[in-house]
Each structure stands twice: as C-alpha cells, then as structure tokens.
C-alpha cells in the first residue's frame, strides 16, 4: 500500500481504522505534519468539484507543492497513452499523482511501477469501479456519529449500477460487519453486488436503517433511451427520500450523499440541510480523509502506528 491508494478494499482492517483515526486527528487539529519538497499532480479526466477541490485543499494543508494538469491541454489529446503520461511526469519529478479517469481499473497495469517508473498513485475515481477516497470519508462520517460499524444497517438507494461509490462502500461496509441493503430501479441494479447485500424495496424496513446513503442519478452514464424515459417526479416518488419517508426514519439515523445532489430528485430539497443530514459534513471530512491518504503515501509509518 505504500505506493498506491487505489481501492479501499486493499487495506487491512487495522490500516483502515488507523487511517480513519488519523483523519479525525487532522480534523481536530492535533496532528498536521509538514511535507517538504514533495510534488503532487492532479489529473482529472472527468469533471469534479468536491473531490478535486478537497484533494487540492488537503495538499495545501500538508504543505505539498501542487500542479494541476488539464487533460484537454495535455498530450493525451495527441494520443499519448496514460502509461507514457505517467512515466513522463515521474521523469519530470512528480512524486505523487491523483487521477480520476472514466476507464474502470485504469490503475491495474501500474501497481508494480508506482513509486519507481511512475509516480505514487491515488485513485480519485475510475469509471463505475472504485471511489476509495469517498469511501474513507464516508466511513469517517459514520464513525463520528456511531463510533463503530458492527451491527449497523446501511441502505444504499439510487443508481446502483453506474455508481463507483456503491461498489466501494458496499464491499468495505460488509467486511466491517455492516448489514447492507440496496434499493433502486430494477434496471440499475448490479447483480455482482449481491454478495455484499440484498436488493429490497425502498420502503422495506426503512425505519430500521441507521444510515440512508443516497446516490445521484448519473445521466452522463445513461443511454439516450434511458435519459428519455427518465422523469424527475416519477423517480422522486418511487426512490427519493421524501418527507413521508423521512418521518419513518429512526431518531438517530443519518442521511448521506456523495454529491452533487439533485434536489427534489434523490432527496427532498428541504432535507438536504435537515438535522439527520450529514451531506455537508461529508464534504468537510473529505479534506481530512484525503490528507490521511496522501500522508499514508509520504510517511507510511505514521499510518501503521496511529491508533494502535
């Protein structure tokens, strides 16, 4: 793990809990190491507000020297392969690179090269594959509220098939002892996730859930036919967190969403800032979770020692 952070499920439970603990220390202001002379590059082939900005904020807080590369102005537009881009950046002196790419598993060919022939690698999202930094900040947010994972019930609702968040979170939550269930349109279910939890109707046992994790409808990944058939009102009625559904939730349940939020689609607009919502807390936690990720690549001994 010392040279890559590409899949949250590559971490042992001890590494994961230590990283969450360090993120909480960063948030409390108790522990801010200064990273001298390290250079990190950010290369996002897909649009991003929260992930891109919070990685840059994390880099600033840690003292990294930062470079932002616009792929539309890079040699990728001339046909340069991702491998050659990475080798070029390593040769120039980039220590770590944060990449978001539409290609699922873009990082697979580079595991052995990371930190040697190419920079150390951070996956900021790969197609509908993994979103490990989002998973870490989500776990951090759950720990802040519940202090533990074992025995919790998490309902993931929405566009499951196209969501890297659903895939990342379902596997790691299941491993940590959480009971995971999924709800959403039948055509957006992903049978490969049934090993981590069952698909149920949205209203089944909704009042027994500890965490409601809503997912954005990813129109950019839908077919033209799917987008034409989609109606906001119908989706909100069938799968959205409406006021009626909100009133059924447990008193200590929390609402989460990786954002961007489509108000009055996945969730009633008034509920985005409700008492149960942790949506903006997730965004805040994203900075500290990503600080822990970057720090684990620069000073891995700190991660192995924190929380023991």
UniProtKB/Swiss-Prot annotation:
Carbamoyl phosphate binds at residues 50-51, 100, 131, 134, 259-260. It catalyses: carbamoyl phosphate + L-aspartate = N-carbamoyl-L-aspartate + phosphate + H(+). One of its GO terms (biological process) is 'de novo' UMP biosynthetic process. L-aspartate binds at residues 78, 164, 216. Catalyzes the condensation of carbamoyl phosphate and aspartate to form carbamoyl aspartate and inorganic phosphate, the committed step in the de novo pyrimidine nucleotide biosynthesis pathway. Belongs to the aspartate/ornithine carbamoyltransferase superfamily. ATCase family. This is Aspartate carbamoyltransferase catalytic subunit. It comes from Oenococcus oeni (strain ATCC BAA-331 / PSU-1).
């Amino acid at each position: 793990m010392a040279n890559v952070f590409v899949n949250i499920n590559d971490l042992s439970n001890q590494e994961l809990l230590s990283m969450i603990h360090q993120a909480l220390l960063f948030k409390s202001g108790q522990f801010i190491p200064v990273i001298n002379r390290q250079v990190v590059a950010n290369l996002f082939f897909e649009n991003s507000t929260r992930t891109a900005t919070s990685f840059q904020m994390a880099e600033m807080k840690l003292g990294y020297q930062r470079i932002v590369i616009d792929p539309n102005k890079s040699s990728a537009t001339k046909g340069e392969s991702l491998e050659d881009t990475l080798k070029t950046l390593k040769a120039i002196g980039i220590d770590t690179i944060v990449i978001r790419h539409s290609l699922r598993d873009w990082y697979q060919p580079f595991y052995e090269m990371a930190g040697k022939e190419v920079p150390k690698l951070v996956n900021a999202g790969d197609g509908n594959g993994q979103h490990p930094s989002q998973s870490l900040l989500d776990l951090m947010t759950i720990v802040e509220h519940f202090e533990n994972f074992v025995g919790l019930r998490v309902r993931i609702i929405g566009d499951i098939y196209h969501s890297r968040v659903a895939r990342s979170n379902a596997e790691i939550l299941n491993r940590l002892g959480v009971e995971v269930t999924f709800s959403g349109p039948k055509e957006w279910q992903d049978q490969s996730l049934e090993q981590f939890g069952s698909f149920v109707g949205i209203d089944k046992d909704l009042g027994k859930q500890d965490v409601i994790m809503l997912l954005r409808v990813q129109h950019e990944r839908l077919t033209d036919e799917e987008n034409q058939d989609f109606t906001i009102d119908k989706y909100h009625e069938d799968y959205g967190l409406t006021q009626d559904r909100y009133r059924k939730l447990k008193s200590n349940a929390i609402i989460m969403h990786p954002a961007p939020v489509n108000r009055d689609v996945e969730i009633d607009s008034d509920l985005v800032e409700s008492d149960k919502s942790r949506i903006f807390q997730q965004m805040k936690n994203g900075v500290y979770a990503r600080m822990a990720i970057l720090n684990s690549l620069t000073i891995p001994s700190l991660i192995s020692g924190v929380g023991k």
